[in-house]
Amino acid sequence: MDEIIFRQYRLGDESRIVDLFIIGAPHKRTTGFWEWINKCGPFGQSIVEVGELDGKIVATYAVMPVQVQFKKELVKAGFGIQLFIHNEHRNINNTILIADRVYKRCKKEGFNFIYGFPNDYAFPLHSKVMGWEHIADFRCMELYTQKIKSDSEYDRDIKIERVEIFNEEIDNLWQQTSIADPAKNAVIRNSSFLNWKFFNNPLEHYIANVAKINGEVVGYMVLKLFRKENVFCGHLVDFLSRKQNEKLIFQSLLHRAFDFFGWAKVDVIFAWCFPSNTYFEMIYSIGFRPTGFNTHFALKPIKNNDLADLTKYDNWFITMADSDAF
């Protein structure tokens, strides 16, 4: 049998990469989605390696560049996506070969680290073979709609509007949040990131609401509808609010979300929200519980820097928007 040739992605590989995903992955993927996530990201194009055999792509690994707030500074990092190898060639040796090629390029490009959410199959390889640090396992927060305790406490002077684009006004919000001060480790939420993630995605449909006080944008929340077998689900994909009046702003956004999910006849609502997250107490008080699906959160050091603050679970602000799965 001929050996797999590992090399950098070249223009024209897209269709054969998507062939590979469709053969072995449950999620719908298209060349449009591949180009959106790897070529159109707000922080630059992904580093992509492939393995080719007999004219077919049998392995691929992509790392998307992101800007992460770390100790009040913006650092260059990567989000690990789309590590996939054809079943007939899936082994530790091929995984290491393609991963090492990606990591060397990440180092050359000045990445400080890579983060990701490896699935149950990939996680042991990441943690035991590929040099990733396990930050935490966490469970999705979930709330069955018939168990909502109350969402009546909200300020009617806070106006909630649905938007079809995030304008530059949203860029001012980040520095006014409790995520920015005191600084959490977090991918920057600016208009470029939010519009790319929620309005340019060629596969997904999102509902974005902003909160306004006296005409000024003071918060936002992004929702998604999702059907899994016979269960109709709602996702709180992303949310952020100004520190001043934080609770009232968030509650107003939640009220609008519940109103929409009620109209849609959603059965259960999901969200990612760590206990250290400023919003955790608010969603816990109305019935959300960490009883949903489990997720592995891990990090791959690229530079020899101090990882102490990066590998502490409580130091991160993470929502579903930080994953490519939602």
Region spans (language model):
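Conserved N-terminal entry element of GNAT/NAT acetyltransferase domains
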Residues: 1-12, 147-168
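A conserved beta-strand-loop-helix scaffold within acyl/acetyltransferase catalytic domains
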Residues: 4-83, 120-121, 166-242
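A broad, structural surface signal
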Residues: 15, 19-22, 100, 104, ...
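Active-site/acyl-donor-binding loops of N-acyltransferases
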Residues: 65, 112-156, 207, 213, ...
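Conserved acetyl-CoA-binding loop-helix of GNAT-fold acetyltransferases
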Residues: 82-85, 90-104, 246-259
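Membrane-interface helix-loop-helix junctions at boundaries between adjacent transmembrane segments
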Residues: 88-90, 98-121, 125-127
